[in-house]
Design a protein with these regions (language model features):
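Long, contiguous interaction/recruitment modules in multidomain scaffold/adaptor proteins
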Residues: 1-50
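Terminal, low-structured helical/coil segments at or just beyond the last alpha-helical repeat
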Residues: 4-18, 144-176
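TPR-repeat structural position
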Residues: 34-37, 71, 108, 142-143
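Canonical positions in the second alpha-helix
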Residues: 46-47, 81, 117-118, 152-153
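TPR alpha-solenoid repeat register
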Residues: 57, 91-94, 128, 163
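Canonical tetratricopeptide repeat
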Residues: 60, 94-97, 131, 166-170
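Alpha-helical adaptor scaffolds
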Residues: 63-121, 134, 138
């Protein structure tokens, strides 16, 4: 009987210690979670200059430039990630972003090369598929392929509501 009491008591203590440890680890993770919202582009550039292989920060900075349509600042960061990152998801995303920037500069063939390489690395990349679908849907010779790609993209449960609505709007304009 005492074995069972000791065993039960030991298990209870173990569960309490485990719970406390998990709580402490969660608090520590929250403490060290990096929030870049209050970090300036200049500060990020400085950190990246000193630590060129800090790919997540480099990607965050490139995305800021991309969102501001400052492609000349975004491109070197995406290129660095595409050439140096071992993370296929980051590499694929960087290539897709490069592909879109190249498309925006009216170089369709090079743009589709980057997007196809992005998809070769990560065949599930919604960004690369979306960009390729948008490019193809505007080309009368590839419009059906573009429609097919975009229709497959909107089926994904990983797509944000805003992105889904944007793609649905494009499809509605071209399916008329």
């Amino acid at each position: 009987m005492t074995k069972w009491i000791i065993s039960s008591f030991s298990f209870l203590i173990f569960a309490v210690v485990l719970f406390i440890n998990l709580q402490n680890n969660s608090e520590i993770n929250d403490e060290f979670n990096t929030n870049l919202a209050n970090v300036t582009n200049e500060e990020m550039e400085s950190v990246i200059d000193q630590n060129p292989d800090i790919h997540p920060m480099r990607m965050a900075l490139a995305n800021r430039y991309f969102d501001d349509l400052d492609y000349s600042q975004a491109l070197p960061h995406y290129m660095y990630i595409a050439e140096n990152s071992a993370d296929n998801e980051l590499k694929s995303f960087a290539l897709a972003q490069i592909g879109w920037m190249v498309y925006e500069s009216n170089n369709l063939d090079v743009a589709t090369t980057y997007l196809n390489e992005s998809l070769r690395i990560n065949s599930e990349s919604l960004v690369a598929k979306s960009y390729l679908g948008i490019i193809y849907i505007q080309d009368p010779t590839k419009q059906n392929e573009g429609l097919e790609i975009l229709n497959s993209v909107i089926q994904s449960n990983k797509l944000s509501k805003e992105d889904r609505n944007f793609i649905v709007e494009i499809l509605e304009n071209y399916e008329k």
